[in-house]
Amino acid sequence: MLVSNHQGYMDILVLGSLDPASFVGKAEIRWWPIFGLFSWWAGTIFLERRNKTALKGPLHETINRLREGGRVVVFPEGTDSDGTGVLPFHSSFFEAAIRAQCPVIPVAIRYSAPGVSSREEVIYWKDRRFLPHLIRLLGVGGIRAQVTFGKPMEPGSDRKALARRVYGEVARMVRVGGAT
């Protein structure tokens, strides 16, 4: 299971280009024009974020995919951020790694582009509208995505403790960059 910070839709394109993986994503994406269809085709595990009782199905699907040897990417911040740090992790999906006895690989993504603020021009966060952001993004040249993979972590038996350990490593990698 890959666990990454999240700065917007570019993260999915970047991580998806490196290795085939399923993503855990918010359920409303399923109904977005074009993206919903691509998400479904790509095997996204849809999660109803505001309904804790609806977590059981996506959690079991994640466990099954991990047990079958699949890669699943989770963004436990639960939303995208501005890239200046890492938001607190929600611990629910760390239970999947524990039940599947699957190592967790911390991942940090950072963006840069010459002459522009990646926070303002590259990262898609907060209440930005998609189409204006995409149009501006297409005009930015030389965007660099730095992806840093941490060492696999054994899950142990406590999802909250696992979430804290992985959070610490992802936050450290975001701060310092490092080998990719």
Placement of each model-derived feature along the sequence:
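Residue-level preference for the first positions of well-ordered beta-strands
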Residues: 1, 44, 71-75, 103, ...
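Catalytic core of membrane glycerolipid acyltransferases/transacylases, capturing the structured
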Residues: 1-52
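Short glycine-rich anion-binding loops that position phosphate/pyrophosphate groups of nucleotides
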Residues: 6-8, 78-81, 111
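A cross-family acyltransferase "interaction/gating" segment
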Residues: 34-37, 51, 84-165, 176
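Anion (oxyanion) recognition and catalysis
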Residues: 40, 66, 98
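Catalytic-site beta-strand/loop segments enriched in glycine and acidic/polar residues
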Residues: 65-94, 179
